[in-house]
Amino acid sequence: MKDLKYFLFLVLVFTIGLKSCSVQKSNTNKTPKIGITYQGGILFYVLQEGDIGYVSGELHGLVVAPSDQSSEIEWGCFGTRIKGANKTAVGTGAQNTLAIIASCKETQIAAKVCSELVLEGYDDWFLPSKDELNLLYLNKDVITNFGDFYYWSSTGYGGFNGWGQDFFSGYQYGNFDEYGYGHVRAIQAF
């Protein structure tokens, strides 16, 4: 009888131990809502399977600066062929921005303005790629603070021009340089 009581006591202790050590699922894996303040800007996109930089089980996405960095600035480097700035996909804006800066010594250009931005201690801002810029357009009502202007992307067009997007119509222009100046809104990846 004494052995039975001891056995039941061990089962009880073991069960309580398992219960207290069980891992509680937390809400930390919830996808944050588009439009919230996040890492110095406003969250506008959470990476999905197939996106460059997507890692299953991890939260990664894109944040936009809360206001324009410039309202009248050139894409820059007129007459200079920019190599490596022709990527359009989500996840390629930073690479395009670096390629533009490496090929162009002008200081007052869209890519440079974005790369030099520091907001709330975050200094990894860049000019969005064509597809990243389109995501901004699609979410502009949630993000707010966007005007119906032409915005630059970091995606080059034909080596000499840059892609831009009209935030009134949503139309994307490959020969955006003919318009001269565009607005700039920096983004960052997390």
Identify the meaning behind each predicted range.
Residues 73-77, 127, 146:
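Non-catalytic, surface-exposed connector residues within folded enzymatic/regulatory domains
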Residues 16, 21-121, 178-190:
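Short, compositionally biased
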Residues 30-31, 48-49, 107-109, 116, ...:
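C-terminal, surface-exposed recognition/capping segments
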Residues 6-15:
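Sec-dependent N-terminal signal peptides
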Residues 7, 24, 93, 138-139, ...:
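Alpha-helix initiation/capping motif
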